[in-house]
Amino acid sequence: MAVGKEIKTKIASVKGTQKITSAMEMVAASKMRKAQEGMAASRPYATNIRNVIGHIALGNLEYRHPYMDEREAKRVGYIVVSSDRGLCGGLNINLFKKVLADAAEKQASGAEVEFCVIGSKATAFFNNMGAKVSAQISGLGDSPSLTDLVGSVAVMLKAYDNGEIDRLHVVYNKFVNTMTQEPTIDQLLPLPKSDDEAISHRWDYIYEPDANSLLDQLLVRYIESQVYQGVVENIACEQASRMVSMKAATDNAGDLIDDLQLVYNKARQAAITQELGEIVAGAAAVG
């Protein structure tokens, strides 16, 4: 029964793949929980510093930092955060589609675009399409630190300081829940004003030793913290997407095994029926 042996070989192969995807699902679930903890730990800082910066942008400062001034958007920079590994569904490609659509709108209005890419998937994608990539970094692992990102962020900040770009955005996947990851584009520069436009009065802070030196450091740290938060959120999204993808692959493998087992049983039944028929026919001929 050559057909039966071939089917059994396929079943064994699919079972082997199912074991791999099941193990990857469990690993991704464990890493996702760890990534969620890191994301939850850093999110309050990122949120609060964003609120502080928003109020500073609305304040009446004697010293106007260049990051607060609106410019005509002739050149736009994107810091794109992706994963280093695949097998995470459409996480990366959905993000790339969103940033390319936004970049196309900017280019349609006459602006130039350039990219700083984080993660090997974004590095490969934007280099292969011939985009202008000003900085790139990959291999950050599952627990990156802020210092890992400082160099790449500094390249884009220097470009902004030199007037080489007029807008700076960070693009990442925002973690909503295990089943939902939302591609997000946040403006970093010029500083976005506070979302609370309905506040009845404006206030300013007291700066020690002076506004100039403090804001120079604070605003750079703000940009770095927002990019870091995007990286941390993206890691949580990556693990959640991988867990869901591997669960789907495991379930599909189970369905395929059931289908192959049914085909095998039918083939075996047909072979037995044929053998019985041959035996009966042979006995009748002898008799």
From Swiss-Prot:
Protein name: ATP synthase gamma chain
Chief localization: membrane
Function: Produces ATP from ADP in the presence of a proton gradient across the membrane. The gamma chain is believed to be important in regulating ATPase activity and the flow of protons through the CF(0) complex.
PANTHER family per the UniProt record, alphabetical: ATP SYNTHASE GAMMA CHAIN, ATP SYNTHASE SUBUNIT GAMMA, MITOCHONDRIAL
Subcellular localization, as worded in the UniProt entry: Cell inner membrane
Superkingdom of the organism of origin: Bacteria
Gene Ontology terms: cellular component: plasma membrane; proton-transporting ATP synthase complex
A GO term, aspect molecular function: proton-transporting ATP synthase activity, rotational mechanism
Membrane topology listed for this record: Peripheral membrane protein
Subunit structure: F-type ATPases have 2 components, CF(1) - the catalytic core - and CF(0) - the membrane proton channel. CF(1) has five subunits: alpha(3), beta(3), gamma(1), delta(1), epsilon(1). CF(0) has three main subunits: a, b and c.
Organism annotation: Colwellia maris
Keywords: ATP synthesis, Cell inner membrane, Cell membrane, CF(1), Hydrogen ion transport, Ion transport, Membrane, Transport
Membrane listed as a keyword: yes
Family: Belongs to the ATPase gamma chain family.
GO biological process terms, semicolon-separated: proton motive force-driven plasma membrane ATP synthesis
Pfam families xrefs: ATP-synt (PF00231)
Cross-referenced CDD domains: F1-ATPase_gamma (cd12151)
